[in-house]
């Protein structure tokens, strides 16, 4: 459990939708994606809102209420190390995408995001971080368009 009082508040992104992800096993599969993305509050002000695109999965950035901080941390634990933390002033971004296939519904495949685009209106231009997905990581780039 993440009972650590030193945890920073997070901005949380949630989306649940059907999509297709290209996996590290080099095949396409229909994916029931339930992604939880967390961005350090030092990187993104609580007031911001906007889209984040991870491959074919899109979500909206929303500020997490203090009461949801524990639930967010629990999701990070449930990701079984699939969340990748990056230290430094840039904060961190992590994604856990359980997909359908192989081990059954919700089985966590090591999916690779083909592209990550964050609107520059959502993130300060100085933001530099990584998206961790399974055992792969991709840079988070800033763009004015998805």
Curated annotation (Swiss-Prot):
A single cellular component GO annotation: plasma membrane
Give TM regions: 1-21, 35-55, 87-107, 111-131
Task: Indicate the secretion signal residues.
Answer: none
Where in the cell?
Cell membrane
Q: Which UniProt keywords apply?
A: Cell membrane, Membrane, Transmembrane, Transmembrane helix
Q: Transmembrane as a keyword?
A: yes
**Highest taxon of source:** Bacteria
Chief localisation class: membrane
Membrane-related topology note: Multi-pass membrane protein
The protein's name is: Uncharacterized protein MT2143
Q: Which organism is it from?
A: Mycobacterium tuberculosis (strain CDC 1551 / Oshkosh)
The uppermost taxa in this organism's lineage are:
Bacteria, Bacillati, Actinomycetota, Actinomycetes, Mycobacteriales
């Amino acid at each position: 459990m993440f009972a650590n009082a030193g945890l920073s508040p997070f901005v949380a992104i949630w989306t649940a939708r059907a999509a297709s992800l290209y996996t590290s096993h080099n095949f396409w599969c229909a994916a029931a994606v339930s992604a939880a993305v967390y961005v350090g509050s030092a990187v993104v002000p609580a007031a911001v809102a906007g889209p984040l695109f991870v491959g074919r999965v899109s979500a909206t950035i929303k500020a997490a209420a203090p009461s949801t901080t524990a639930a967010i941390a629990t999701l990070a634990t449930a990701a079984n190390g699939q969340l990748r933390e990056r230290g430094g002033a840039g904060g961190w971004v992590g994604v856990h995408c359980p997909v359908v296939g192989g081990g059954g519904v919700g089985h966590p495949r090591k999916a690779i995001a083909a592209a990550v685009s964050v609107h520059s209106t959502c993130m300060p231009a100085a933001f530099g971080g990584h998206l961790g997905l399974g055992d792969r990581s991709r840079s988070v780039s800033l763009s004015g368009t998805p």
